[in-house]
Design a protein with these regions (language model features):
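N-terminal leader/auxiliary helical segments
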Residues: 1-184
Length: 184
């Protein structure tokens, strides 16, 4: 459920990067548009939105208190490992073919927000994001990169799951509740 993150790989310009533009949208307005696209993609994005809304304050606080490259990505990767270990579940990634099979559904949804996005550009983003994710999960034996206590962030993660359930219900009912989609 990567939502707009795959579009960080769309476009060369930092200022006009599709991923950045999508993340700057007001959540309620964004989901009002997305709900008219592919329901599964929109629901997945709703879970991503919910988790980001609840967890990002911890990620940003860590970034603000520490120096280093890619702290945001490292923190989120470590949190994913922490959650998977707490749940006793191995992290997995969909096969490449299944990811790429979503190209047109994803593109059709994003065009509701950014009309200039093309199917070819979407496919390119999905390929790059898939490769990035594979690199992140490249080894079976995964270790934490940061020396951090994720227990408080885990509580925020649990709140994000609860919010995610509500957000998905809103999306599937095509009723974008202002209370749910005002956390961004």
């Amino acid at each position: 459920a990567q939502g707009g993150d795959v579009f960080f790989f769309y476009g060369i310009s930092y200022k006009n990067n599709a991923g950045r533009l999508l993340h700057r949208e007001q959540p309620q307005i964004l989901f009002e548009r997305l709900k008219e696209g592919n329901a599964a993609y929109c629901a997945g994005w709703a879970t991503h939105y919910a988790l980001d809304s609840c967890v990002h304050p911890f990620v940003l606080a860590y970034e603000g208190a520490h120096r280093g490259a890619f702290l945001h990505q490292k923190y989120e990767k470590d949190l994913g490992l922490y959650v998977s270990r707490r749940a006793g579940v191995r992290r997995m990634i969909l096969p490449r073919e299944k990811v790429l099979a979503c190209t047109f559904a994803v593109c059709d949804s994003i065009k509701k927000v950014l009309p200039y996005v093309t199917a070819a550009g979407t496919a390119s983003c999905l390929k790059r994001h898939y490769a990035y994710t594979r690199r992140q999960l490249k080894t079976k034996k995964q270790e934490f990169e940061l020396d951090c206590d994720y227990s408080q962030t885990y509580k925020a993660y649990q709140n994000g799951v609860t919010l995610g359930v509500r957000a998905v219900q809103c999306v599937l009912e095509k009723d974008i509740d202002e209370e749910v989609f005002s956390k961004g």
